[in-house]
């Protein structure tokens, strides 16, 4: 029985991994469709599309899937049923934390209902457009795989006009994150590539103007569960919160 139980657990874990992988593929494919629809189908002349393709390839999406998504977005392939649109939703979590949710949907009513259910379940509220948007600004973020020569990076950033940089660690990897104005994101990215920095990602992110400190473990748990629930929704592309968790709030989570 133990062996059977172990095998059942492995199958369930694999199903969860496969489901998550499927959602990632779907989100990245939709991002390619929208990018191709908004600009040129040639990634060389469309930075948004080029970035979406790079992310898709990094995630292991086959080239034929990428080509099909580009064809759908550019109108070269019948995309009936794939009329995706980008929508931003806003709301509050417990403790007054503001949340911005970026979604791609072919059914606004379905997406809004799913979001509202998640907010209600974890003590939040889905608000009207504009209720928290003023608490955030957009920033270009370029992620560079380390190790990075800081002197070389600083010299390059002075030349390109980037705003700032910081070193972070993600999945046990050292990464340099460069912040730029949105208008020069492409220029700075290409300049860093030309100087042989290994670019992992270049994207536009929402950044909170001020953070809300959460010290209570129960509030932290509710917020994390809310953000996880929102991110798990098929139509959701990203979730941003202006929250800073204090160390004691995360104890035991």
From Swiss-Prot:
Keyword Protein biosynthesis: no
Subcellular location: Cytoplasm
Major location (coarse): cytoplasm
GO biological process: regulation of DNA-templated transcription
Keywords tagged on the record: Cytoplasm, DNA-binding, Transcription, Transcription regulation
PANTHER family the record matches: TRANSCRIPTIONAL REGULATORY PROTEIN YEBC-RELATED (PTHR12532:SF6), TRANSLATIONAL ACTIVATOR OF CYTOCHROME C OXIDASE 1 (PTHR12532)
Protein name (database record): Probable transcriptional regulatory protein AM1_1847
């Amino acid at each position: 029985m133990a062996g059977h139980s172990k095998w059942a657990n492995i199958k369930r874990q694999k199903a969860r991994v496969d489901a998550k992988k499927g959602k990632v593929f779907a989100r990245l494919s939709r991002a390619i469709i929208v990018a191709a629809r908004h600009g040129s189908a040639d990634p060389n002349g469309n930075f948004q599309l080029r970035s979406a393709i790079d992310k898709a390839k990094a995630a292991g999406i086959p080239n034929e899937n990428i080509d099909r998504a580009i064809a759908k977005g550019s109108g070269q392939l019948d995309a009936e049923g794939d009329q995706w649109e980008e929508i931003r939703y806003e709301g509050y979590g417990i403790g007054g934390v503001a949340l911005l949710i970026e979604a791609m949907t072919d059914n606004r009513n379905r997406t809004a209902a799913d979001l509202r259910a998640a907010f209600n379940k974890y003590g939040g509220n889905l608000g009207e457009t504009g209720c928290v948007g003023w608490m955030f600004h957009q920033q270009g973020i370029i992620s560079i795989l380390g190790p990075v020569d800081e002197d070389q990076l600083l010299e390059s950033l002075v030349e390109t006009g980037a705003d700032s940089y910081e070193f972070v660690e993600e999945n046990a990897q050292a990464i340099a994150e460069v912040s730029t104005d949105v208008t020069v994101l492409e220029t700075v990215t290409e300049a860093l590539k030309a100087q042989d920095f290994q670019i992992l990602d270049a994207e536009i992110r929402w950044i909170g103007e001020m953070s809300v400190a959460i010290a209570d473990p129960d509030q932290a748990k509710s917020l994390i569960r809310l953000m996880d629930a929102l991110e798990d929704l098929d139509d959701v592309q990203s979730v941003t919160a202006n929250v800073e968790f204090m160390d004691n709030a995360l104890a035991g989570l």
